[in-house]
């Protein structure tokens, strides 16, 4: 069984965190979770500590931004020997088979460093507009469920990263506080 670490960076994410973390723990494939809280003032870290005590919680005390906070999680993943890291935005969630499908795709394609599911809008009726513009080069209906497609860019809201890739590329540049880290990576 491959070891997966899910990194969730939070900042005042109370309205989303229950669904986000709940979806991870309802996954059909076990994963550990580290929550890096960027100085929330809405009770997010306290809620995580009380309702998701199995998650590792690191409170930075201030907003370091997406990249720097994820780098804390990257270091933890490498130190603890995880095979895969999954970046999950605080306002996002996964389906029960997300990890098993992505790990299967990574195992069948060991040259892949990063893989992502199609990122849907909250309505689940269409892809997230930012994902569609940057990642899809044809109408969604032309993609076959279960297949893997190369994309020029994938937003880091849902990234599964292999350990090998993380060791090769390293973390995000601290020059990017919020947005652009994934494009630069």
Map each language-model feature to its residues:
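Cell-envelope/extracellular polymer assembly enzymes that use nucleotide-activated donors
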Residues: 3-5, 32, 184
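A conserved acidic beta->alpha catalytic loop
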Residues: 23, 37-46, 62
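Short, acidic, metal-binding catalytic loop of nucleotide-sugar glycosyltransferases
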Residues: 22-31
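A short, conserved alpha-helix in the catalytic core of glycosyltransferases
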Residues: 153, 159-161, 165-170, 175-185
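Conserved donor NDP-sugar-binding/catalytic core segment of glycosyltransferases
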Residues: 95-129
